[in-house]
Amino acid sequence: MRKRLLVVLGLVLAMVATLQTGAQAKLPTSGGVCVEHDVGAGFEGRGTRVRDLVEAPKKDPVAKWVRRHGNQADRAADRADRGQAITVPVWFHVIRKDATVAGGNVPASRINAQMQVLNDSFTGSTGGASTGFRFELQGITRTTNKGWFNLTGGGKDRKIKQALHRGGLETLNIYTAKLGANLLGYAYLASDAEEVGVLDGVVVHFETLPGGAFSIYSEGDTATHEVGHWFDLYHTFDGGCDGGDFVDDTAPEASPAFNCPVGRDTCVGGGVDPITNFMDYTQDSCMFEFTRGQAVRMQQAWSAFRA
């Protein structure tokens, strides 16, 4: 097993009393964690579960593949530039404790709304670059299990996915549940997908889907952020001002941005912080874009690890 196990534990939430920046929840010691929003009075952060939260791996698997497969890499970049559509099959797995909405029984209308958010975000309809990906819902499974609904540990995650996972590396499995440890969501990177097998996929708190109860984080962008990780994107702030997201056209950012701090500039040179990027930690209404460089990386990661 490679030492670089990148579980993108999206959206670990820092429980705080206000919507201002502050201390973040303690991160797990094994693996790194994608820090996301708080489910208390306000949320902070939105992140990745990588080996280290603040330091992306120095050896990029996507770049390694690009060096070895130049022609395929060029074709992947061309797809991104043309917005040529690759359709990703999606399975939604609803984990609920009972038949009520409060018990996690997310209605089909909210799942369809989440699918629309994903398609709008990745096709550039919200104002960013078109990534060349679209998503097509294949089906919805519903599982009533009180123990699984409170998804608090890795053992449950494995059991759930072993029972419910559908398709291969090219299939996006999205699981909804009530996450513990102040989490909004998590995912595995494309470059780890083959190694982790059925664990591959995206998990989000059911209240983050459009129409959920998480206030400024209930427009569906938690899933967008985590699917970005599923395509092997890192946070815009990974590596700080040195840049560690392996994308040239995202401005350097010293630390995660919260809320929507317009004009924030934490690094000298390179422009203002990319607070509107889906791979930062800002609130849903603030983020609306991927960059062309991120689109190219996603296409290359797809060709390398999922196609």
Give the role of each language-model region:
Residues 98-108, 212-217, 285-286:
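Second-shell loop/turn segments in exported
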Residues 88-94, 134-137, 171-176, 200-206, ...:
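Structural recognition of the beta-strand scaffold that forms the well-ordered cores
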Residues 26-171, 178-180, 303-307:
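Propeptide-to-catalytic entry region of secreted or membrane-anchored zinc metalloproteases
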Residues 112-115, 119, 201, 221-224, ...:
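Extracytoplasmic/secreted envelope proteins and their assembly/folding machinery
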Residues 1-25:
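Secretory targeting and sorting signals
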Residues 162-235:
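Active-site-proximal segment of zinc-dependent metalloprotease catalytic domains
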Residues 216-288:
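The catalytic-center signature of Zn2+-dependent metalloproteases
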Residues 288-307:
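Pan-zinc metallopeptidase signature
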